[in-house]
């Protein structure tokens, strides 16, 4: 069931001409698919029942969203005891959750959802400016509008300040003003996250991070991904691996697929000599890292190694 859902998501993305990389080969992971089209980068977590999303995975996904300037989306079919409904956005640990049909509508058809689920039912975001302009154009006072809706003047003022409301109330407002009164939900800008590069990492990995920072890179450690940090220097973004695992080339290959999908550089820092590169991933010996004195020199080293056979 999970594999079929992953396959369907990949097909939808390919139909919409996204570059796609899936992470089915790695665990643990905070996202299953990364995709890019033009300036849009998506980090996608796929779960049949979204109850199984862990809070630490959600936090890591939000952090990566900020670092990579990406948009996180969780895709599933069930939430708690119910099936997810088409056209409705749910929320889990601050991440947007939608079903496969809603994802298809959004990615392929360009149809944004308008309804979100929250305790108490389904709600919509009101277009406050449009409501106020329509009321004034019709010559209705706030009191007139309140009387027609059966609510207080204060409530109408809240609607015109942008408060959210139920579907039934939104329908009444639209009937009165004679125009569309709700806003689409922007799935690409759903999440706001704060990040800090000052996260402490101990041992040999911490030493590598410290050296990258010494030469002038901003370094954001990452968990639950096939890379260990995102290193940044001005406009250069480098997915960076440095865990000395047994199958280092296999991990680097997966890292390369992700970097190619999002059009980023990729480097793997190692204790001992490996191949010069695997796909788009450049291997850098620790001693080479310690021999460079600036971020600019490090980027030059990567480009130089990338051109070598």
UniProtKB/Swiss-Prot annotation:
Molecular function terms, GO-annotated: DNA binding; DNA-binding transcription factor activity
Lineage: Archaea, Methanobacteriati, Methanobacteriota, Archaeoglobi, Archaeoglobales
CDD domains: HTH_XRE
Cross-referenced SMART domains: HTH_XRE (SM00530)
Alphabetical list of Pfam families matching this protein: HTH_3
Start-end of DNA-binding region: 142-161
Gene3D superfamilies recorded: lambda repressor-like DNA-binding domains (1.10.260.40)
Alphabetic keyword roster: DNA-binding, Transcription, Transcription regulation
Taxonomic superkingdom: Archaea
Protein name: Putative HTH-type transcriptional regulatory protein AF_1787
Organism: Archaeoglobus fulgidus (strain ATCC 49558 / DSM 4304 / JCM 9628 / NBRC 100126 / VC-16)
Keyword Transcription: yes
Keyword Transcription: yes
PROSITE patterns linked to this entry: HTH_CROC1 (PS50943)
Chain ranges of the HTH cro/C1-type domain: 131-185
